[in-house]
Amino acid sequence: MTKQECAIKYITENYLNFNRLRHDVIADKLQIRIADSLENASLQNTPMGLQFSDEDTWREMTKHDINSIVCHAAQEYDANITSREVITALQSDLIPDVHPLREYVLSCHTWTEDQPDWIDFVARQVHVVDASNIDRTRGAVDRAEPCRSASPEDRPTGCSVSRKSTASITSDLKCSASETNYSEPRERSKADALWRICFKKWFVAMVASWMNDEVVNHQVLVLIGRQGIFKTTWLEHLIPPHLRAYACKLANSNDLNKDERLRIAEFGLISLDEIDSMNNRELNQLKSVITATDVNERAAYAYTKERRVRLASFCASGNRRDFLTDITGNRRWLPFEVESIQNPFFTTLPYNRMYAQAWALAQDPLFSYWFDLDEIEVLEQHNQHFRDETNEEQLLPILFDVPAEGKGEFMTTAQISERLVTYGNIKKPMALSRLGMVLGAAGYQSTRPKIGGQLIRGWLVYQRDTDEIASLKRLLKE
C-alpha cells in the first residue's frame, strides 16, 4: 500500500468505523469524539479500548490529535507516513459532514398540537412591564407565581397551544385573559401578551433559520432592565448546554469588521450586550447585518472569498430603555422592559420539547413566524416607548401644533429648525431632512407654495404664543 492508502485505512478502521470523526459544516472544522470517562469505558471490541455512548462529547480536532494519528498509523503499518497524507485524508469527503444544530433539532421528540405549549412555558419565566405604564410607574405588572423546573414529570398544565393564539399578535391582544387557552396566576397585560407572542415567533423563526437556508430571522429580541436580573444569562440559556459553542456575543464597535460579519454564518445565536450604548451609526450598521441573507468574505487562512449562508438569529440586552433612534420605523426590534426573570441557574429548561415544538410550528402552514402588516403596526406603536427622542422632537409639540384644516402658517423646515434650536439652545441640531421626517410623522402637512416666482417646500404649522407655551410647561411639570 502507498503511504496515502495506509493513512486512509488507519483513519477508517480506527475512527470512521466507530463514528469518531466528523466535519462540522457550521464552524468548518474537524471534530473528534472522546469518551467522557476513560476509567469506566468498556474495553470490548472498540479501538483503543473505548466504548462510546450518546453522552460522549465532540471537540475540535487539534494538531496534537493529527500528530497522534500520524504516529500510530506509521507504527501500525511500518511506513513513513507524514502529516501530509493524514491531513489530505481528513480534508476529503471521507469525513462525514454534520450540521450540529440541525442534528439536534431532528433528534428531539415529535411535538403535536394537543401537547403542552413549552415555548410559552419558557416565555412566562420573564415578567415584563406594561409599555403603556412605563413612563408613569415602574413595576406596573404584578409578579407571576414562580415557574417550576420543566421535566417530563413536571409539565405545565392548561397551557396547550392553539393556532389562533400564536398566529397573530393583533387577534391575541383583542382577547381577554378569560378567552385564552392559558391558565395563569395573574391577569395578562397587553405587554405580557405581546411578549409571549413575539418570543414564540422569534424562537420559531430562529429554529426555522437553522433548518432552512432560505429562512432568515429578521427580528431582534431585546430585554431591557436593571442590572443583575439575568437578562443576558436567560437569553444565553435558550441554547442547550452542549450547543453553546454555536452562540456568541458581539461587542459594540464603530465598525463591523470582516470577522464580526462572518459570525452570522458561524453561529446560531448572536447576543448583543449593552445594546443601549450603541450610537445611531452602529445601529444602522447592525441593521444591515440583521437583514443580510449571506456573507461573502475570506475567512482566516482561506485562499479566496466564499459565500456562506446566514445562520444566526440576534438577541440583545441593555439597561436604558430609549435606545431606538430610527425615525422612519423600528420593526426589526422586539424590545421589552423586564421587571424580573426567574433565575436560569435554578431552572431546567425543557430543551428537547421546546425545540421539537418550534420545529413543528415552523413546518405548520397555519402558523406564521413572521410579522404581517397589522402586527408590524402593533409593534411600531409598542416600540415608540423605546425610542430616543431628539431635542427637536421633544420641543416640537410645545412650540408648534398641527393647524386646523385650511389654516396654518407656512414655514420652511429651516425656519422651524431655527426656532426649535434657538428656544432649546440646541448645540447640535438634527439634519433638516431628518426634521422633515419628524414633521411628517407628527401629522404636519407638507406644501409647496410659489413665493417670489419660485416653488418653496415647507409646512403648514400653528405657532403657539407665549401664554400657551407657559401653560403647557406647567402641565408637563405636574
Which residues make up each language-model segment?
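Long, low-complexity, charged/polar intrinsically disordered regions in eukaryotic proteins
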Residues: 347-383
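DNA transaction DNA-binding modules
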Residues: 132-142, 146, 153-154, 168, ...
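P-loop NTPase catalytic core of nucleic-acid-dependent motor ATPases
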Residues: 92-141, 177-265
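AAA+/SF3 P-loop NTPase mechanochemical coupling elements
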Residues: 260-265, 299-317
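A short helix-turn-beta junction within AAA+ P-loop NTPase domains corresponding to the substrate/partner-engaging
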Residues: 324-343
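N-terminal nucleic-acid engagement/recognition segments and initiation subdomains in replication
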Residues: 1-133, 176, 193, 197, ...
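Conserved catalytic/switch belt of AAA+ P-loop NTPases
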Residues: 283-306
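Conserved AAA+/SF3 P-loop NTPase catalytic/coupling segment centered on the Walker-B
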Residues: 267-291, 324-329
